[in-house]
């Protein structure tokens, strides 16, 4: 399943993995997973975090290494995003709940994830998804972007 991933996808997943792997030791712990999820406005219990790790922890050592992370991502991609997952993701970005993702909201979420982006990079991300050219991303544009990746 992992062999169906492109080099570009693997590189993107490596970048995502390093956002989770705060101490850079090559493993994601429940603590690191919790930190990232809380920065995205989620509030998982310790048991839920452990369950998430156990789901993909092939060698049973209690953490997720990059090959396990890749397997999980490949599985998730094969099991394409449900509308519910996309709606939840949209809500994470749409902080004020007005139905649009502004550049400021996008920057806020990316910064919480530890991703420092320049104004140009944020504007570029908005432009790529902003089909109607109003300078922000509405739900339909967000769905198109999520399904086209």
UniProtKB/Swiss-Prot annotation:
Binding locations of Ca(2+) 2: 57, 59, 61, 63, 68
CDD domains (alphabetical): EFh (cd00051)
SMART domains in the record: EFh
Sequence positions that bind Ca(2+) 3: 94, 96, 98, 105
Chain positions with N6,N6,N6-trimethyllysine modification: 116
Keywords assigned: Calcium, Metal-binding, Methylation, Repeat
GO cellular component: a single term: myosin II complex
Sites where the protein binds Ca(2+) 4: 130, 132, 134, 136, 141
UniProt-annotated binding residues for Ca(2+) 1: 21, 23, 25, 27, 32
Domain EF-hand: 8-43, 44-79, 81-116, 117-149
GO MF annotations in UniProt: calcium ion binding
UniProt entry tagged with the keyword Metal-binding: yes
Keyword Cytoplasm: no
PANTHER family: CALMODULIN LIKE 3, MYOSIN LIGHT CHAIN 1, 3
Additional notes on this entry: This protein has four functional calcium-binding sites.
Protein purpose: Calmodulin mediates the control of a large number of enzymes, ion channels and other proteins by Ca(2+). Among the enzymes to be stimulated by the calmodulin-Ca(2+) complex are a number of protein kinases and phosphatases.
Family: Belongs to the calmodulin family.
Protein name: Calmodulin
Species in which this protein is naturally found: Physarum polycephalum (Slime mold)
